[in-house]
């Protein structure tokens, strides 16, 4: 073999070796890039899954919280309805007083008030027939005995009240209607009623 052939053969052999090394390096670099991309992809996938889990948990907590709030509000509404019913029934019971019981209520209420004794009594149209002249005479005599004027009279004005009465003089009213009396007791009795109904 001539030196030229040896040299050519050596150059080709070196070129092949270098090409193989370059290919091997390129393959390694390719694998490295693919591995990095896979790792990044997996990391991104985990982050997306984690974010989705957090969002789902937050949404579930919000739904549960809203549901608890609705349940609480529904319970409060139901309790309030029952309490209102108790007070409405109290007014109805007062409306169903007999004539004598009603007149006793009016008499004792008026005699317990600090009045001058010349006011007008405003009543419901339903109660007009219960108060007669004899009742007014008796009531005025009792007021006189207490040092009052004893000049109470039934007003020509009617009010849409469910019972009881309103005393009127010079633009000032003392409201002793059944609904006003029950409402005035509501604040102090409501807690007792809640305990009686719901404990």
Curated annotation (Swiss-Prot):
Gene Ontology CC entries for this record: proton-transporting two-sector ATPase complex, catalytic domain
GO molecular function: ATP binding; proton-transporting ATP synthase activity, rotational mechanism; proton-transporting ATPase activity, rotational mechanism
GO biological process terms, semicolon-separated: proton motive force-driven plasma membrane ATP synthesis
Key words, A-Z: ATP synthesis, Hydrogen ion transport, Ion transport, Transport
UniProt xrefs under Pfam families: vATP-synt_E (PF01991)
Keyword Transport assigned: yes
HAMAP family named among the record's database cross-references: ATP_synth_E_arch
Function according to Swiss-Prot or TrEMBL: Produces ATP from ADP in the presence of a proton gradient across the membrane.
UniProt family annotation: Belongs to the V-ATPase E subunit family.
Protein name: V-type ATP synthase subunit E
Organism: Clostridium botulinum (strain Hall / ATCC 3502 / NCTC 13319 / Type A)
């Amino acid at each position: 073999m001539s030196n030229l052939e040896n040299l050519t053969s050596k150059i080709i052999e070196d070129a092949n070796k270098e090409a193989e090394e370059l290919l091997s390096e390129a393959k390694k670099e390719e694998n490295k890039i693919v591995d990095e991309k896979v790792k990044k992809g997996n990391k991104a996938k985990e982050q997306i899954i984690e974010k989705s889990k957090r969002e789902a948990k937050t949404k579930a907590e919000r739904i549960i919280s809203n549901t608890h709030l609705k349940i609480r509000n529904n319970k409060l509404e139901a309790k309030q309805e029952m309490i209102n019913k108790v007070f409405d029934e109290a007014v109805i019971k007062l409306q169903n007083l007999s004539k004598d019981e009603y007149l006793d209520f009016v008499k004792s209420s008026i005699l317990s008030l600090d009045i001058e004794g010349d006011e007008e009594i405003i009543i419901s149209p339903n109660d007009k027939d219960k108060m007669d002249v004899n009742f007014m005479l008796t009531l005025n005599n009792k007021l006189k005995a207490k040092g009052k004027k004893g000049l109470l009279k039934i007003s020509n004005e009617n009010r849409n009240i469910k019972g009881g009465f309103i005393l009127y003089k010079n633009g000032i009213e003392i409201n002793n209607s059944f609904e006003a009396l029950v409402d005035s007791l509501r604040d102090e009795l409501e807690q007792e009623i809640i305990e009686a109904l719901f404990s």
